[in-house]
C-alpha cells in the first residue's frame, strides 16, 4: 500500500495499547502515526516504540489528540466509555475514522456511536477476535436448533483488573441468542443468583462472572437439556489476537464510507 493508514493508539502504555503498537508495527498497510496517554502521565514525550521494546518509531507520546491531529487518519480506542466519547467528538470534528473496542457503554453512549456513524466510519465491537466472531455465528445456529427447550447459561472470566461485568463479549453473546429466539435480553437476562431463587425460568438467559489473576478472556455458552448439553467456548491466551483483529478492522474501514460497523461486517459474516 503506497499510503499506509496512520493510526493513533489511545492509552498506548496500557495493556491493550502496548499490544496494539506491536500489532500495527508488524502489519502491512498501517503505521503508528500517534500514541496517546492521559495528561500528566510520566511517559509523555517518550518514543512509543522504545518504551515498549519495539525500537525507535519516531512517534513521541502525546497527551492530546489536537496536538497531533495532522499525524493520523484513524483512532483505535480501547479505553473507557467517557474517554472514548470525548475522542469520538474529536473524530467527528476532524473527520477521523475510529475502531472502538471500549466496553461498558450505557444506552446514551451507544446512541452517540450510532449517530456518529452517520458522518464518519466506525467499527465498534465488543471483541475483535476472529474466533469469537465465529462463535457468534455458531451461537445463532445453536439457538435456532436448541434454544427453545434448553436452559441457556453464559459464563465468562477475565483478569482481576477488568472493571465492568459481565464482559461486553458475554453481553453480545447473550444478545445474539436472545435476538435469535425473539427475546429482549434486558427482560430475560439473570445476572448471578443468590439465596432462595426458586426454580429456573426456561425463558431466562443466565450470566456468571469470574474475575481472577491474569485471565485474558474466556467465554462459554451452555445449552443444557436433561441428559445432554452443548457448550460453545472460546479461550484467548494473548491480547494480541484482539489487537490483530482491531488492526484488520482498521484496514477494512479505510475502504469504507461513513457508517457504524462491527466485526461481522469486517469478516463478511453477515
From Swiss-Prot:
NAD(+) binds at residues 11-16, 37, 101-103, 125-128. Its main location: cytoplasm. GO terms for cellular component: cytosol. GO terms for biological process: diaminopimelate biosynthetic process; lysine biosynthetic process via diaminopimelate. The active site is at 158 (proton donor/acceptor), 162 (proton donor). It is found in: Cytoplasm. It catalyses: (S)-2,3,4,5-tetrahydrodipicolinate + NAD(+) + H2O = (2S,4S)-4-hydroxy-2,3,4,5-tetrahydrodipicolinate + NADH + H(+); (S)-2,3,4,5-tetrahydrodipicolinate + NADP(+) + H2O = (2S,4S)-4-hydroxy-2,3,4,5-tetrahydrodipicolinate + NADPH + H(+). Pfam families: DapB_C, DapB_N. GO terms for molecular function: 4-hydroxy-tetrahydrodipicolinate reductase; NAD binding; NADP binding; oxidoreductase activity, acting on CH or CH2 groups, NAD or NADP as acceptor. Keywords: Amino-acid biosynthesis, Cytoplasm, Diaminopimelate biosynthesis, Lysine biosynthesis, NAD, NADP, Oxidoreductase. NADP(+) binds at residue 38. It comes from the Bacteria. PROSITE patterns: DAPB (PS01298). Gene3D superfamilies: Dihydrodipicolinate Reductase, domain 2, NAD(P)-binding Rossmann-like Domain. Pathway: Amino-acid biosynthesis; L-lysine biosynthesis via DAP pathway; (S)-tetrahydrodipicolinate from L-aspartate: step 4/4. HAMAP family: DapB (MF_00102). Catalyzes the conversion of 4-hydroxy-tetrahydrodipicolinate (HTPA) to tetrahydrodipicolinate. This is 4-hydroxy-tetrahydrodipicolinate reductase.
